Amino acid sequence: MALHAAVKGKLISVIGDEDTCVGFLLGGIGEINKNRHPNFMVVDKNTPVSEIEECFKRFVKRDDIDIILINQNVAELVRHVIDAHTAPVPSVLEIPSKDHPYDASKDSILRRAKGMFNPEDLVR
Protein backbone atom coordinates (compact mmCIF):
# COMPACT_ATOMS: atom_id res chain seq x y z
CA MET A 1 0.00 0.00 0.00
CA ALA A 2 1.50 3.30 -1.08
CA LEU A 3 1.46 6.30 1.17
CA HIS A 4 0.35 9.52 -0.48
CA ALA A 5 1.58 12.87 0.77
CA ALA A 6 -1.16 15.29 1.62
CA VAL A 7 -1.32 18.05 -0.95
CA LYS A 8 -1.97 21.48 0.44
CA GLY A 9 -4.99 23.10 -1.16
CA LYS A 10 -4.71 26.11 -3.41
CA LEU A 11 -6.38 29.43 -2.79
CA ILE A 12 -8.95 31.60 -4.49
CA SER A 13 -8.10 35.30 -4.50
CA VAL A 14 -10.47 38.23 -4.94
CA ILE A 15 -9.97 41.72 -6.32
CA GLY A 16 -13.16 43.68 -6.02
CA ASP A 17 -15.35 46.17 -4.27
CA GLU A 18 -15.99 46.00 -0.55
CA ASP A 19 -19.25 44.07 -0.83
CA THR A 20 -17.71 41.42 -3.08
CA CYS A 21 -14.66 40.93 -0.88
CA VAL A 22 -16.69 40.82 2.33
CA GLY A 23 -19.04 38.25 0.81
CA PHE A 24 -16.20 35.96 -0.20
CA LEU A 25 -14.40 36.49 3.10
CA LEU A 26 -17.55 35.50 4.97
CA GLY A 27 -17.61 32.44 2.73
CA GLY A 28 -14.20 31.49 4.08
CA ILE A 29 -11.69 32.34 1.35
CA GLY A 30 -9.60 34.77 3.41
CA GLU A 31 -5.98 33.73 3.94
CA ILE A 32 -2.72 35.46 4.79
CA ASN A 33 0.46 33.78 3.55
CA LYS A 34 3.72 33.43 5.46
CA ASN A 35 4.83 36.83 4.16
CA ARG A 36 1.67 38.37 5.66
CA HIS A 37 0.12 39.08 2.24
CA PRO A 38 -3.67 38.57 2.01
CA ASN A 39 -5.35 36.85 -0.92
CA PHE A 40 -7.82 39.68 -1.46
CA MET A 41 -7.84 43.36 -2.34
CA VAL A 42 -10.66 45.80 -1.70
CA VAL A 43 -10.93 48.35 -4.50
CA ASP A 44 -12.78 51.63 -4.14
CA LYS A 45 -13.07 54.75 -6.28
CA ASN A 46 -9.84 56.14 -4.78
CA THR A 47 -7.69 53.07 -5.43
CA PRO A 48 -4.96 53.87 -7.98
CA VAL A 49 -4.94 51.68 -11.08
CA SER A 50 -1.24 50.99 -10.52
CA GLU A 51 -2.06 49.45 -7.14
CA ILE A 52 -4.65 47.15 -8.75
CA GLU A 53 -2.13 46.15 -11.43
CA GLU A 54 0.53 45.36 -8.83
CA CYS A 55 -1.91 43.30 -6.78
CA PHE A 56 -2.99 41.30 -9.84
CA LYS A 57 0.63 40.65 -10.81
CA ARG A 58 1.43 39.62 -7.23
CA PHE A 59 -1.48 37.15 -7.21
CA VAL A 60 -0.36 35.70 -10.56
CA LYS A 61 3.15 35.11 -9.20
CA ARG A 62 1.99 33.40 -6.01
CA ASP A 63 2.17 29.62 -6.25
CA ASP A 64 -0.56 29.13 -3.65
CA ILE A 65 -3.27 30.84 -5.75
CA ASP A 66 -5.10 28.92 -8.49
CA ILE A 67 -8.08 31.19 -9.17
CA ILE A 68 -8.29 34.98 -9.29
CA LEU A 69 -11.80 36.42 -9.09
CA ILE A 70 -12.03 40.03 -10.19
CA ASN A 71 -15.02 42.33 -10.52
CA GLN A 72 -15.56 43.03 -14.19
CA ASN A 73 -15.60 46.79 -13.70
CA VAL A 74 -12.22 46.54 -11.94
CA ALA A 75 -10.93 44.23 -14.68
CA GLU A 76 -11.74 46.94 -17.22
CA LEU A 77 -9.27 49.23 -15.45
CA VAL A 78 -6.42 46.72 -15.81
CA ARG A 79 -7.53 44.99 -19.03
CA HIS A 80 -4.05 45.18 -20.58
CA VAL A 81 -2.54 43.30 -17.63
CA ILE A 82 -5.26 40.64 -17.67
CA ASP A 83 -4.90 40.17 -21.43
CA ALA A 84 -1.15 39.70 -21.01
CA HIS A 85 -1.78 36.78 -18.62
CA THR A 86 -2.05 33.72 -20.86
CA ALA A 87 -1.18 30.90 -18.47
CA PRO A 88 -4.03 28.56 -17.52
CA VAL A 89 -3.17 28.80 -13.81
CA PRO A 90 -4.06 30.90 -12.03
CA SER A 91 -7.36 31.13 -13.86
CA VAL A 92 -8.90 34.58 -14.03
CA LEU A 93 -12.66 34.85 -13.72
CA GLU A 94 -14.48 38.13 -14.14
CA ILE A 95 -17.51 38.41 -11.90
CA PRO A 96 -20.29 41.00 -11.55
CA SER A 97 -20.51 43.39 -8.65
CA LYS A 98 -23.56 44.72 -6.89
CA ASP A 99 -23.51 47.93 -8.90
CA HIS A 100 -22.19 46.62 -12.24
CA PRO A 101 -23.89 43.66 -13.95
CA TYR A 102 -21.85 41.13 -15.90
CA ASP A 103 -21.33 41.94 -19.58
CA ALA A 104 -20.05 38.95 -21.56
CA SER A 105 -18.90 41.19 -24.42
CA LYS A 106 -16.30 42.79 -22.13
CA ASP A 107 -14.89 39.52 -20.76
CA SER A 108 -11.60 38.94 -22.59
CA ILE A 109 -11.15 35.49 -21.06
CA LEU A 110 -14.55 34.39 -22.36
CA ARG A 111 -13.75 35.82 -25.80
CA ARG A 112 -10.46 33.89 -25.78
CA ALA A 113 -12.26 30.68 -24.80
CA LYS A 114 -14.86 31.14 -27.54
CA GLY A 115 -12.05 31.53 -30.05
CA MET A 116 -10.73 28.08 -29.14
CA PHE A 117 -13.87 26.31 -30.35
CA ASN A 118 -15.62 26.17 -33.66
CA PRO A 119 -19.39 26.41 -33.02
CA GLU A 120 -20.00 23.77 -35.69
CA ASP A 121 -17.98 21.26 -33.65
CA LEU A 122 -20.42 21.59 -30.77
CA VAL A 123 -23.54 20.86 -32.84
CA ARG A 124 -24.39 17.21 -33.33
From Swiss-Prot:
Domain of life from the UniProt record: Eukaryota
GO cellular component term of the entry, any: proton-transporting V-type ATPase, V1 domain
Keyword Transmembrane belongs to the record: no
One Pfam family recorded for the sequence: ATP-synt_F
One GO MF term attached to the UniProt entry: proton-transporting ATPase activity, rotational mechanism
Keywords for the protein's UniProt record, in alphabetical order: Hydrogen ion transport, Ion transport, Transport
Subunit structure: V-ATPase is a heteromultimeric enzyme made up of two complexes: the ATP-hydrolytic V1 complex and the proton translocation V0 complex. The V1 complex consists of three catalytic AB heterodimers that form a heterohexamer, three peripheral stalks each consisting of EG heterodimers, one central rotor including subunits D and F, and the regulatory subunits C and H. The proton translocation complex V0 consists of the proton transport subunit a, a ring of proteolipid subunits c9c'', rotary subunit d, subunits e and f, and the accessory subunits VhaAC45 and ATP6AP2.
Family: Belongs to the V-ATPase F subunit family.
Functional summary from the UniProt entry: Subunit of the V1 complex of vacuolar(H+)-ATPase (V-ATPase), a multisubunit enzyme composed of a peripheral complex (V1) that hydrolyzes ATP and a membrane integral complex (V0) that translocates protons. V-ATPase is responsible for acidifying and maintaining the pH of intracellular compartments and in some cell types, is targeted to the plasma membrane, where it is responsible for acidifying the extracellular environment.
Protein name: V-type proton ATPase subunit F
Organism: Manduca sexta
